[in-house]
Amino acid sequence: MRYGSGLLEEILRRTDLVQLVGRRVKLERRGRVMWGLCPFHKEKSPSFKVENERRTYHCFGCGKGGDAFKWNMEMEGLSFPESVQKLAGEAGVELPAWTPEDEAREQKKKSLYDIVEAACVFYETQLRGQVGSEARQYLKSRGLDDAAAKQFRLGYSPSNNSLIAHLKAKDVSLDDMVTAGLARPGEDNRAPRDFFYDRLMFPISDSRGRMIAFGGRGLSPDAKPKYINTGETSLFSKGQQLYNFATARPAALKDGSIILAEGYMDVIALVRSGFEASVAPLGTALTEDQLHLLWRTAPEPILAFDGDDAGLRAGYRAARMALPHLKAGYSLRFAFLPPGEDPDTLIRTSGGGGMKKILDSAEGLARVLWRVETDGKDFSTPERRAGLERTLGEIVSAIRDGKVADYYRREFEERVFESFKRRAPRATQQSRKTEGRNFRRDAPRFGAPLESISPALKAS
């Protein structure tokens, strides 16, 4: 439903923003402005201000800001319509009546949430029963006990269409099961069947903690693919969600940091070792929507990737995807694990302390881009060095924020200069005196449109 600007303005006018923010942040008055410690990042001195007159909040440290609608969206994980509805109710503003179509659509969605939740409970029950013994044994082999299974609501999907029978007994129609992504319709005179069978189940929730989908790991050696997710539904789009986000969000807002691992088991291992603000994408490379979800909780999320070539390529893809969205104070950091290790295996062998060392040494985005383009490569000829400069120029050109792009340009210029200055012919005494002063004039200038893409980028 669309809301007119006049209605939205009336809701904001009736909302006491200081009181709203004050429920979560201790505020102190300085003149007509209220100040407090920013809830979006760690700080020791208050740089977060709230102004009722302007009806806005803003942090001078991390740049977060907005109005009452944005506050509820950030702090409670609400969508914009949900934030409008909540504030309107608190402010006593009557919203336009829903059409019958609006009401039917909302009721349908609510019904689907209930169905997915019922499936989650069913899978949990199966894991604890006799049919789930193999799944429990697998969890044990990965160092996870019953408490871990309960904490993450892990489950098991049998291979006998038992979910369909269970939901039918609860008066759930087959059409609704299919719509929720829990069943496959029958084809060619074959009976409908469960979408997941003989798999360890990882429930996926939305940002408010409502169950919306599942990831399933095959337990049979012949299971292909090893992992599958619920298909796209009206509740779930895998490129817009992150595993464990609803639980990780409060911890991330408190600590100002969030970790993105590669898979479900990595997240579970991280959380169990004390890294509560840990999430994972859902079988895809990091998407723009997921990047913005991360930035809503922390200005510099840490991406924890395997330390092999595949992990480095994954980090490079994430870095290139993020370039157009970079802005002052918001970037990515990368923690590359030793070859052959992932967070789950590293924590099992080295504990949380070993993982902390890796996270503490996380590299900045610019450093990772430089590494991928230069590590192990020969730049002994002018043509190869020119090719590197061309590729770095493309990277800078992809950054839309002018100020951030300028800093990347400077950093790459300095790295090129430091890397190649020793290759130059012996300078005269006079040229050595002026070398430093002339760097800005003579150094390569990155950012112009490029004619080609580097082989490294094509390979990624």
Please report, for each region that a protein language model flagged, where it lies by residue:
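N-terminal structured subdomain of primase-like DNA metabolism proteins
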Residues: 1-103
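Phosphate-handling DNA/RNA-contact segment within nucleic-acid enzymes
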Residues: 3, 15, 30, 104-112, ...
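A charged alpha-helical hairpin associated with nucleic-acid processing machineries
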Residues: 5, 206-207, 249-258, 285-301, ...
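Conserved active-site segments centered on acidic
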Residues: 6, 82-137
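A general alpha-helix detector
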Residues: 20, 67-71, 118-122, 134-138, ...
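Short linear loop/turn motifs
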Residues: 33-36, 86-90, 98-105, 149-165, ...
